[in-house]
């Protein structure tokens, strides 16, 4: 599958097996995949600082978590998966001076893991489901080792 820009429409065109998917299917796909969370939805997230030398191991664990999330969760209603409104991970080198990147980095990487769930009940199901992930103890080990700032059962308070 390839993804090409459609500047005339403001969204990509998806080619599947070299055949163009009908515009109505594309529109439906984008409506389903767009960020569908709102103020009041339940959130979980954490931000942590990791030494550069340890980032590769953290990258691998987070990639495993993301794969588990893809296997067990979906941003659209999908049979056999927990409907989760949003999941993403961001990563950046920590700057010595965020107003002047030319001053270099601290030798730390900042990771942010963000999830948005429909409500507290769905978040609870996510926590329960997480117990079945074979690397959950390693994941919790991140909390012990890096002392992240954590938002547990937070609420979306603003969005575009």
Label the predicted regions.
Residues 6, 10-112, 116-129, 145-160:
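Short S/T/G/P-rich N-terminal loop/turn motif that feeds into the first structured element of a domain
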Residues 108, 134-136:
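N-terminal soluble domains immediately following signal/targeting peptides that reside
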Residues 141-142:
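Loop-helix junctions at membrane interfaces
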């Amino acid at each position: 599958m390839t993804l090409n820009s459609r500047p005339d429409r403001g969204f990509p065109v998806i080619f599947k097996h070299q055949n163009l998917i009908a515009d109505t299917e594309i529109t439906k796909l984008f409506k389903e995949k767009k960020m569908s969370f709102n103020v009041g939805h339940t959130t979980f997230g954490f931000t942590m600082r990791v030494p550069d030398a340890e980032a590769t191991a953290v990258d691998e664990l987070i990639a495993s978590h993301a794969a588990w999330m893809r296997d067990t969760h979906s941003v659209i209603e999908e049979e056999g998966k927990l409907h989760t409104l949003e999941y993403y991970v961001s990563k950046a080198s920590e700057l010595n001076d965020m107003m002047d990147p030319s001053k270099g980095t601290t030798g730390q990487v900042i990771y942010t893991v963000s999830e948005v769930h429909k409500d507290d009940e769905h978040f609870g199901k996510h926590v329960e489901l997480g117990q079945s992930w074979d690397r959950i103890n390693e994941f919790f080990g991140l909390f012990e080792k890096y002392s992240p700032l954590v938002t547990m059962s937070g609420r979306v308070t603003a969005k575009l």
